[in-house]
């Protein structure tokens, strides 16, 4: 006998632009420029409201934009969850960072060795913040660490595509009193892949560990501006080597400190450093390092963590499981961690009665503007075939966010139209079982794909 499910449909990155239709073309508002007959129909027929998914309403600093991780964490918890960015900022502001016992042990281990800081250098606040790196380097210097290298990952996805030169200028100024050197610069496309495209990680590994890449002739900001002039942008920046070129820079006994606070895009590079049986790409050398992370990326890593996860109880998945009900989490690869790890409070725990389905994201394109439908059709087929087996379904459609990140408006429009068709199919099937649906988003993105200037 089929169940009558409750389905939470998360249209990832489908936001509301305050300028409305009058500003739709100027802002590149794909949600309004697209043809969305089903969205328009249900918006007219059923109750609706708006949600705030940024700033203090989701546990971020005032004025900080939301993101997928934060949105899913708050949705799953059913309350405001103060984010790692907020917690870390507060710790630094209150002068408590230097007193962190794990941090003290880390920098004690780095004395007489080389300390490598690795992470995303921007103020996007989604995966990291460059000011955290400056604060950490200051504590390292005060702790007696002398040899500090920074392997900077440029953003261009959660920030301006050419903002990296400015961030590296600010970073160099902040690091000057610590003696830390920017050794490597590489785009997040290579260093932070999360879809097992190991050939991208290989390029970043070779740069960070072996010093392979274009040798810089000028300071990092000037080198980046020269790349911009050639059409290269931060996200896709190929490795730039600023110190110790063509030598093994990460050596046995060194300390490697990944300072991103968001886990999902850190794991592949982390595993390359940690796993003796790693087979994602040919490492050529495998330095045995003291690996440290700012937050917990995966409990199984068994590495020191500076900020441990918050303990969240009575979250949605737990309550449903405790009631003896069955639940399904389903998304394509790009958003699978969000409906599982993040929705479950930032832990890997899978509750009793919780099933998970991952639909592979396309691997035949470099960027999703080239395939804006992504795997939404396959996700829709999978979920409609399974709906009657579950009491609760958590469903994510990735397209509005992932295509929104590309900034290609025509593709964003196609992504929105694709999702409108897919949501129609899910709604019709759910209602045929006597079920109910809540259609929402975790944060906005494709409602503003162009900068007005």
Question: Regions from the language model: what does each represent?
Answer:
Residues 1-453:
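Feature captures the catalytic ectodomains and active-site-proximal regions of enzymes
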């Amino acid at each position: 006998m089929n169940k009558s499910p409750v389905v939470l449909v998360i249209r990832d990155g489908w936001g509301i632009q305050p300028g409305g239709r009058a500003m739709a073309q100027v802002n590149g508002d794909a949600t309004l420029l697209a043809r969305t007959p089903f969205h328009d129909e249900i918006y007219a027929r059923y109750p609706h409201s708006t949600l705030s998914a940024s700033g203090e309403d989701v546990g971020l600093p005032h004025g900080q934009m939301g993101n997928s991780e934060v949105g899913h964490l708050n949705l799953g918890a059913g309350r405001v969850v103060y984010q790692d960015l907020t917690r870390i900022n507060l710790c630094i502001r209150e002068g408590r960072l230097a007193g962190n016992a794990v941090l003290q042990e880390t920098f004690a281990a780095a004395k007489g060795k080389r300390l490598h800081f690795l992470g995303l250098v921007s103020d996007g606040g989604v995966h990291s913040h460059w000011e955290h790196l400056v604060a950490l380097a200051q504590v390292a210097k005060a702790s007696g660490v002398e040899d500090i290298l920074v392997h900077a990952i440029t953003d261009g996805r959660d920030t301006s595509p050419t903002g990296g030169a400015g961030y590296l200028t600010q970073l160099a100024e902040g690091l000057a009193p610590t003696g830390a050197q920017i050794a490597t610069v590489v785009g997040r496309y290579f260093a932070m892949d999360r879809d097992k495209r190991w050939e991208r990680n290989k390029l970043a590994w070779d740069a960070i560990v072996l010093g392979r890449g274009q040798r810089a002739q000028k300071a990092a900001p000037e080198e980046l501006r020269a790349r911009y002039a050639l059409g290269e942008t931060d996200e896709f920046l190929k490795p730039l080597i600023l110190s110790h070129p063509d030598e093994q820079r990460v050596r046995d006994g060194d300390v490697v400190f990944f300072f991103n606070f968001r886990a999902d895009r850190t794991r592949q590079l982390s595993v390359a450093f940690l796993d003796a049986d790693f087979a994602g790409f040919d490492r050529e050398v495998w330095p045995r390092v003291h690996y440290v992370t700012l937050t917990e990326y995966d409990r199984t890593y068994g590495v020191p963590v500076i900020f441990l996860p918050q303990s969240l109880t009575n979250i949605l998945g737990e309550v449903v499981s405790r009631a003896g009900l069955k639940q399904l989490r389903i998304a394509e690869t790009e958003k699978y961690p969000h409906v599982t790890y993040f929705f479950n409070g930032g832990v890997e725990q899978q509750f009793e009665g919780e099933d998970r389905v991952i639909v592979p994201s396309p691997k035949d394109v470099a960027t999703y503007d080239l395939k804006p439908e992504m795997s939404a059709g396959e996700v829709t087929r999978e979920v409609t075939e399974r709906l009657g087996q579950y009491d609760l379904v958590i469903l994510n459609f990735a397209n509005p966010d992932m295509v929104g990140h590309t900034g290609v408006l025509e593709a964003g429009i196609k992504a929105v139209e694709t999702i409108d068709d897919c949501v129609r199919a899910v709604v019709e099937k759910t209602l045929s079982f006597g079920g109910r649906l809540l259609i929402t988003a975790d944060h906005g993105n494709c409602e503003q794909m162009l900068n007005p200037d």
